[in-house]
Amino acid sequence: MGPPLAPRPAHVPGEAGPRRTRESRPGAVSFADVAVYFSPEEWECLRPAQRALYRDVMRETFGHLGALGFSVPKPAFISWVEGEVEAWSPEAQDPDGESSAAFSRGQGQEAGSRDGNEEKERLKKCPKQKEVAHEVAVKEWWPSVACPEFCNPRQSPMNPWLKDTLTRRLPHSCPDCGRNFSYPSLLASHQRVHSGERPFSCGQCQARFSQRRYLLQHQFIHTGEKPYPCPDCGRRFRQRGSLAIHRRAHTGEKPYACSDCKSRFTYPYLLAIHQRKHTGEKPYSCPDCSLRFAYTSLLAIHRRIHTGEKPYPCPDCGRRFTYSSLLLSHRRIHSDSRPFPCVECGKGFKRKTALEAHRWIHRSCSERRAWQQAVVGRSEPIPVLGGKDPPVHFRHFPDIFQECG
């Protein structure tokens, strides 16, 4: 048997006593002593899944009090919990009119009033501390209600319940996939994946959803609300997940790596598109000529050949072009831009093809004579000299080489 518990220090009048539960007597335990309450503001901050989990925990806690032998009447709070109402109700508030930290206060109203007010203000600023305060209060309350029947954990008939409660091992298994859940509400929500049930409908467009949180996210489309702003650029998003993905553009995070070339990407769809280079996959086919393409953008550009679409007009002369590259090349006619200079003589050209044709003038006479001899009296393709064939107009006018004799 373990060592006896040290006695609590006696309360001195005028001083704040040690934090204990509401009642110092072990037998005077009510559901309000171990329940957690939320204010209307705190309740609004909870997501639907968190509210469902909270209801399950409160129902379970109320049932455990009865299993421990405490005669506890069913409070109105439990009736509100069992109704699974999403809106906050006065039945959900602390029956003593205090915050959820009321179960952890000292003896004496006058001595502990200052600490109680400070505690309530602290919990208002940080509602998550309710969970910590609740755990501390249960640990302080549990030895006071323990009797010799439950003191020895090996002989205690409630030991299995304690083990399951403390470790949260209350599995509810899905009969379809075998996945386990801690609470029946989570299991019921999961089973809609298998059944296809969509009990939550949008009142404006009649779209249906399997979970309430999906409906709430969808309703942002109708309201136009975007409650999640980016702290870096101020752009707003409807969903928290979309904001997290967007922030990768600022952080430079690239969590998706290609297994073939180790390239990294910010988004998974970019990785999937990139991997087509390695696999050779071309999932998009042209309905007119059956050519296949790896990307939808290439297919859209190719289809302009069949449709005759020319979406790029020249702002100077109005001539239209099928591709933006052709428009860019054409606009050099209206400007003095000559971005392709010859490295031999410095002459500039507006097109790269014109530069390549010009550079044949600077070839040695032996190279040009060899090409001229090769094409005389032959019908075969012209041999490649220096990695490239002569320009087309050179083939039709071989007298251009007469300057070399």
Curated annotation (Swiss-Prot):
Residue ranges of every copy of the KRAB domain listed in the record: 29-100
Positions with biased composition (Basic and acidic residues): 112-126
Keywords: DNA-binding, Metal-binding, Nucleus, Repeat, Transcription, Transcription regulation, Zinc, Zinc-finger
GO biological process: regulation of transcription by RNA polymerase II
Cell compartments where the protein resides: Nucleus
GO cellular component annotations of the record: nucleus
Main location: nucleus
GO molecular-function term, one example from the UniProt record: zinc ion binding
InterPro entries named in the record: Ikaros_C2H2-ZF, KRAB, KRAB_dom_sf, Znf_C2H2_sf, Znf_C2H2_type
Zinc finger (C2H2-type): 172-194, 200-222, 228-250, 256-278, 284-306, 312-334, 340-362
Chain segments carrying region Disordered: 1-26, 88-126
Gene3D superfamilies in the cross-refs: 6.10.140.140, Classic Zinc Finger
Family: Belongs to the krueppel C2H2-type zinc-finger protein family.
Function according to Swiss-Prot or TrEMBL: May be involved in transcriptional regulation.
Protein name as it appears in the record: Zinc finger protein 785
Organism field: Homo sapiens
